[in-house]
Amino acid sequence: MSKSNSMNSTSHETLFQQLVLGLDRMPLMDVHWLIYVAFGAWLCSYVIHVLSSSSTVKVPVVGYRSVFEPTWLLRLRFVWEGGSIIGQGYNKFKDSIFQVRKLGTDIVIIPPNYIDEVRKLSQDKTRSVEPFINDFAGQYTRGMVFLQSDLQNRVIQQRLTPKLVSLTKVMKEELDYALTKEMPDMKNDEWVEVDISSIMVRLISRISARVFLGPEHCRNQEWLTTTAEYSESLFITGFILRVVPHILRPFIAPLLPSYRTLLRNVSSGRRVIGDIIRSQQGDGNEDILSWMRDAATGEEKQIDNIAQRMLILSLASIHTTAMTMTHAMYDLCACPEYIEPLRDEVKSVVGASGWDKTALNRFHKLDSFLKESQRFNPVFLLTFNRIYHQSMTLSDGTNIPSGTRIAVPSHAMLQDSAHVPGPTPPTEFDGFRYSKIRSDSNYAQKYLFSMTDSSNMAFGYGKYACPGRFYASNEMKLTLAILLLQFEFKLPDGKGRPRNITIDSDMIPDPRARLCVRKRSLRDE
């Protein structure tokens, strides 16, 4: 069974509903007040956009409906039409540079043939984390700590990644526990409708907490609640402040209920991390917090500094992973012919040697299915995000002024036969596309889920590719494998694969969709 690009169709009318999922827990008066404030800020932003000039980069702009459409309207439309605007630009220009206009900034989109040229720039000329900080108003959402140093990257690359093979057993133990807490009670043969999106967030949160905080503190309910709330409050606060002129943000931010919640989350996170650090005695703890404490120097050693890094790392590790897993579950239920081959592979590997250190590396089909699902449904439509801090001229003569933001249209590239391997057309979903290619030893490493190159940049590319992608890959393969062994999944009767929601340049699995689940019994073996 194959699926076309309709998998990626967006639900424009649900944009506001998506935001409301985060707002509906607030008191009614607070929600109304937030809407009034956001509307007033948008009016201010409207005036500024109408009167101000745009990017000085001399490359084509895509997305305008006509020469009469004002820039402020194009920026606003990008919120719900970002995917189609980027795709339109890629299909039209493909091997040439173009730009898109979104709320708060213009982004210069570079094609694949420029990637190797720009990725070699030194760190003093370009920053990869700054676009994320800007998108989520880092000065107010406490993201500026990531601009001060790369402590978190050093810890992930030098301590976490080398330990991954030894963490398989630890992660499985926590996942087994998490399933007893987060999956609903089910009788044999009883199908139960579940909110798989929320379940994935909670499962990944618990596994991540075990790796982040160690066995003694990973089930701290205050930390689990804080990390869940922090991501929600950061997203809402950042999204609203993105449309507010910088000069007004100091006055608008304190009025936002989500911002006040965020401050409470930061305070709670600081308290939990501070208590753990003060209670730790000596060295030898094998968790990210301990590694970060040991690797920190100077101001990095401050509890506030470490706590904020831990919160942002939790956000990145939990929610992008949970969304990728939710996409994969939707794809699995939409293409149920993959379920038994994947389950058989897991049973074969585990039956031969148990959950040993190399078990996850032998899940070739599972790895391929996750990579193909991500190809169709990446969380980020644009990757390789950079902001230049020094003017430069590319080989074709294009001048990139200081302060310019660039990105690569990685999702559009992965719908192009020039960048998708195998005989199956890129418009068709082939869950075993990559495992078939990897059967040739020459490509055994190249097409792993966690690997990146200039054709597949879902995790970024080069020295600034996502440092946690190897951990995330293992976490997802482990979670999907255990779910396949213990449960059956299907779409509700009469339902197709849930449509994705595109907000700005992010692709989100529909959080309102449901799947049906039941326990597997011994006779299923």
Swiss-Prot record:
Reaction catalysis annotation: ent-kaur-16-ene + 3 reduced [NADPH--hemoprotein reductase] + 3 O2 = ent-kaur-16-en-19-oate + 3 oxidized [NADPH--hemoprotein reductase] + 4 H2O + 4 H(+)
Top EC class of this enzyme: oxidoreductase
Where on this chain does heme bind? 466
Transmembrane region positions?
31-51
Q: Where in the cell is it found?
A: Membrane
Q: What is the protein's name according to its record?
A: Ent-kaurene oxidase
Cite the CDD domains for this sequence: CYP503A1-like (cd11041)
